[in-house]
């Protein structure tokens, strides 16, 4: 997902366009008509905020034995990312089947986790990678493409 855009809205849109999730949304009778997709379910109130809608979908996914991996490339400390991280903390606290794989510069991730309401990120598992070895990449390309 793109951290320069509204991540919760983007996640909800991606869930609604995924074949597996659409089936879950329909079977759970989750009314997403407020967001411009889905159908109105008779007798059901539409969900009017993204976080609540995502929680409802994740709860149904959990009942169906499904899990969700969210990937974010180039994490930055902006309002969209802060709101998403706060919501992600709620998803995890509610033991929902959601996982996050985020990449970015150390400085950007450090700045984000230093936000006073996002310090839970310090406790999250992290794997710090070293820079790629240019010579190894070059040799691999030579091997793959039979370059002498």
Predicted regions and their residues:
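Generic structural signal for well-ordered alpha-helical scaffold segments
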Residues: 55-59, 89, 142
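Conserved small helical "lid"/interfacial subdomain of P-loop NTPases
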Residues: 129-148
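Sensor-1/coupling segment of RecA-like P-loop NTPase cores
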Residues: 62-64, 68-71, 77-83, 87-118
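Conserved nucleotide-binding/hydrolysis micro-motifs of P-loop NTPases
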Residues: 2-3, 77, 105-110, 132-137
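Proline-centered turn/helix-capping motifs that create local helix->coil transitions or kinks
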Residues: 20-23, 113-114, 137, 148
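A short helix-turn-beta junction within AAA+ P-loop NTPase domains corresponding to the substrate/partner-engaging
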Residues: 114-132
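Alpha-helical scaffold elements adjacent to nucleotide-binding pockets in ATP/GTP-utilizing enzyme cores
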Residues: 3-14, 83-87, 111, 120, ...
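P-loop NTPase nucleotide-binding core
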Residues: 1-70, 75, 97-98
